[in-house]
């Protein structure tokens, strides 16, 4: 039988809370040491208890060294993000270079290779641009096709509904025409009846005649 999820909440009993803290803290530090040994990872853990007592672990060197490494790595990431933000002049220069490359690539593609010499780096950059363009073109084409298919399905549904309405109207009109023809026939004195047999032979009469004939031959009278 599967066990349900246990809801995590604060342990109200202070003794139980302290015992759980000690056990979980020891398990966490043990797992950190094992991870450091197995994967050669540098791990630093800082824990403050509810009473403000400090517990820390540095698997490599000291905690101060790990903190300095953390600050240095965080600063490099922040600088990298800041470097990505170019000023308008640099951005305009980059765009101008891209435009020149694309114009040069177009001339090269359309056969003007004698006058336009492109390096391997320029050709690689042009190839990347072309791949991006092809992806965008295919995406736009697929979106248009999906929209057209949805429009056709919508029109198909509308045509089916209109066809059903027309069929219902045709059935109603045919019923009215049949009723009108029957009324007209009755007014003109024409009735459609099943032809009756003028003469129907009674089987009892045949049987009675046969019996009288046989009785006379044998000397009996009826």
UniProtKB/Swiss-Prot annotation:
Record has Transcription regulation as a keyword:
yes
Q: Where in the cell is it found?
A: Nucleus
Among Gene3D superfamilies, the record links this protein to: Transcription factor, MADS-box (3.40.1810.10)
Q: Name one GO molecular function term.
A: RNA polymerase II cis-regulatory region sequence-specific DNA binding
Task: Provide the alphabetized UniProt keywords.
Answer: DNA-binding, Nucleus, Transcription, Transcription regulation
**Stored Pfam families:** K-box, SRF-TF
Residues forming the K-box domain are 85-176
* One of the GO biological process terms: positive regulation of transcription by RNA polymerase II
Which InterPro entries does the annotation name? MADS-box/MEF2_TF, MEF2-like_N, TF_Kbox, TF_MADSbox, TF_MADSbox_sf
MADS-box domain location is: 1-61
Task: Report, as the record phrases it, the tissue specificity of this protein.
Answer: Expressed in leaves and spikelets (rice flower).
Q: Chief location of this protein? A: nucleus
GO cellular component terms given for this protein = nucleus
The job of this chain, per UniProt, is described as:
Probable transcription factor.
What is the name of the protein in this document? MADS-box transcription factor 26
The taxonomy runs:
Eukaryota, Viridiplantae, Streptophyta, Embryophyta, Tracheophyta
- As recorded in Swiss-Prot or TrEMBL, the protein's gene is named MADS26
